[in-house]
């Protein structure tokens, strides 16, 4: 990693009035120009981290660094960061121009420069021409764009976003995900985004920190975290998962449901108890006699792009399957999957141990070749 723009070194936070510890020895580094997400449920500590970076809260212990310099005692207005709050915190009695220009006016920036910079900021968020519009006459998405324009007009090193999409409807929220991500890429500013929505985190982030009970449970790229969850919490919090108890017989061989299957994981003790994860979309429905497992369909829901089927095997384990075909309740079907579809989780493995094992035993991802090259390669393999 290049020199980090933001770093936390053994940062903890305890609220003195209640004695509640909300952050426990947090360590991380953030590179400049990337989109980071703090992902967790309510009370996990994600917003506390954001507020400590902003200077709205003090760390009880540990160091907070900006460009390698300790900023624990630096006041809010002296930090080169800007926060976009969930409520947007706009001034309702001011129009769009005055809201966006507010910080520049406080700094006594020349009037002509203010006009130029406001126009450029509004153009960035697709609100050019809205300068005189009343805040109260804007939609939720437009208000959010104004808040973002106000955040970027000072060209801060870091923009902090505290669940800014949560108040929007689904369609607008999806549109704003694209806009925020593209804006961050154009500006090259470090974004730190807080959310409880795993789909937002997966869609927008370069790097995700999954939080639970004041700790960072796992960090990595969206693909890393989705494909290789470190433990039961992450596997269930990020997407849907089928999780079963198993035993790692030896490297690349796991036993669950009374059968042994090839896998791509290793680095564990022989006969070590583990948890096995198979995602619903990785299960292929086959004829019963052709499947690696047989299950009986209990119920199903139509989700638009697929049917979500709930089925049970003869040991009573529940299976969720995603299929484009409708099942018949009560019918017995086969389930097929590949070794790459099986993800192994050790019990009580630390992130350091997990990262070391994954690096040694799991195959590295092939470089991205694009869709066309991938299609041509598949056809070549089929014809050879």
UniProtKB/Swiss-Prot annotation:
Annotated residues for binding of ATP: 40-47
Localisation: Cell membrane
Membrane topology type: Peripheral membrane protein
Keyword flag ATP-binding: yes
Main EC class the enzyme belongs to: translocase
Domain ABC transporter, residue spans: 6-238
Reaction(s) catalysed (UniProt annotation): ATP + H2O + polyamine-[polyamine-binding protein]Side 1 = ADP + phosphate + polyamineSide 2 + [polyamine-binding protein]Side 1
Keyword Membrane: yes
Alphabetical keyword list: ATP-binding, Cell membrane, Membrane, Nucleotide-binding, Translocase, Transport
Disulfide bonding pattern of the chain: none
PROSITE patterns per UniProt: ABC_TRANSPORTER_1, ABC_TRANSPORTER_2, POTA
SMART domains: AAA
Coiled coil: none
Transmembrane residue ranges: none
PANTHER family: SPERMIDINE/PUTRESCINE IMPORT ATP-BINDING PROTEIN POTA, SPERMIDINE_PUTRESCINE IMPORT ATP-BINDING PROTEIN POTA
Function: Part of the ABC transporter complex PotABCD involved in spermidine/putrescine import. Responsible for energy coupling to the transport system.
Self-association state and partner proteins as the record states: The complex is composed of two ATP-binding proteins (PotA), two transmembrane proteins (PotB and PotC) and a solute-binding protein (PotD).
Family: Belongs to the ABC transporter superfamily. Spermidine/putrescine importer (TC 3.A.1.11.1) family.
Official protein name in the record: Spermidine/putrescine import ATP-binding protein PotA
Source organism per UniProt: Streptococcus thermophilus (strain ATCC BAA-491 / LMD-9)
Primary gene name: potA
